[in-house]
C-alpha cells in the first residue's frame, strides 16, 4: 500500500492517494484530473565558477 501526497493544480489542496487501489486519479474536492507532486522547500547551493 503505497500512499502518495499530491497537490491539486486547480484548488491547491493536498490529496493523499493510494496508487495501488485507485481506479482514477482525481481531486476529491473539485474533480480536477491535474495533480502534481509538491517539491520539498530545500535551498540548494550552487558553486560559482
UniProtKB/Swiss-Prot annotation:
InterPro entries: RNAP_P/RPABC4, RPABC4/Spt4, Rpo12
Sites where the protein binds Zn(2+): 11, 27, 30
Transmembrane segments: none
Gene Ontology biological-process annotations: DNA-templated transcription
Protein EC: 2.7.7.6
Family, per entry: Belongs to the archaeal Rpo12/eukaryotic RPC10 RNA polymerase subunit family.
Cofactors (names): Zn(2+)
Subunit record text: Part of the RNA polymerase complex.
One GO term describing the cellular component: cytoplasm
Record's keyword annotation contains Nucleotidyltransferase: yes
Keyword field contains S-adenosyl-L-methionine: no
HAMAP family referenced in this protein's UniProt entry, alphabetically: RNApol_arch_Rpo12 (MF_00615)
First and last residue of the signal peptide: none
GO molecular-function terms, A-Z: DNA binding; DNA-directed RNA polymerase activity; zinc ion binding
Pfam families: Zn_ribbon_RPAB4
Subcellular location: Cytoplasm; Chromosome
Organism, scientific name: Thermococcus kodakarensis (strain ATCC BAA-918 / JCM 12380 / KOD1)
Broad class of the protein's primary localization: cytoplasm
Functional summary from the UniProt entry: DNA-dependent RNA polymerase (RNAP) catalyzes the transcription of DNA into RNA using the four ribonucleoside triphosphates as substrates.
Cofactor notes: Binds 1 zinc ion.
Substrates-to-products reaction catalysed: RNA(n) + a ribonucleoside 5'-triphosphate = RNA(n+1) + diphosphate
Protein's recorded name: DNA-directed RNA polymerase subunit Rpo12
Keywords: Chromosome, Cytoplasm, DNA-directed RNA polymerase, Metal-binding, Nucleotidyltransferase, Transcription, Transferase, Zinc
